[in-house]
Amino acid sequence: MAYNKKYADWKRKIWFTIKAPAIFNEVELGETPAYKPEQVIGRRVELNMALVTNNYQLQNYKGIFKITKVEGTTAKTELEGIKMYESIIQKWVEPGRDKITDSFVIKDKDNRLVRVKPVLITNRRLHRKQGTAIRNIWRNYFVELGKKLSFEDMVMKILNKEIPEQLKIQIKKIYPPLFFAIRQFYLEPREKHILLIE
């Protein structure tokens, strides 16, 4: 049989098992091949949170995990963020309704930068002052929450709907939402030039 360099090189690769962080019980996220352990560091994997947690109620979100350490053939990860599937949000968008989005950065209690992207949909167009008031509600809420909780703690409270439910109570005072969610929540690289909300 003719020598196939590509096949021979592939056979020399090692398969590393990717594990979730401790907050998700270090469940297996998949596998990734590499020649050396250091080649695995920095790789990312995105996976539906229902598969990560074995909880189908979290199927609207995907988690982003980054490999930060390798022990033997086990690649350990840290959570970089969660993102809601855009199709979930689009189901609520109809003519005559209003969609309010926002994007801002806060600090968590460990001084890490966190990007927060809420989305709100109402059954009619809101006045500009109402939109501004609603944005102020969730911005102030997350600034104060970040002083008390870590990024991971806030992620868990988003997934279990504690944070969205608390915010909906406050938002209703301005206008009742048809749909409200934290569509994206992730760690922001410090090297980027950003405007921090404090």
Swiss-Prot record:
Keywords: Ribonucleoprotein, Ribosomal protein. The gene is rps3ae. This is Small ribosomal subunit protein eS1. Belongs to the eukaryotic ribosomal protein eS1 family. It comes from Nanoarchaeum equitans (strain Kin4-M). GO terms for cellular component: ribonucleoprotein complex; ribosome. NCBIfam families: PRK04057.1 (NF003142). SMART domains: Ribosomal_S3Ae. HAMAP family: Ribosomal_eS1. GO terms for molecular function: structural constituent of ribosome. It comes from the Archaea. One of its GO terms (biological process) is translation. Pfam families: Ribosomal_S3Ae.
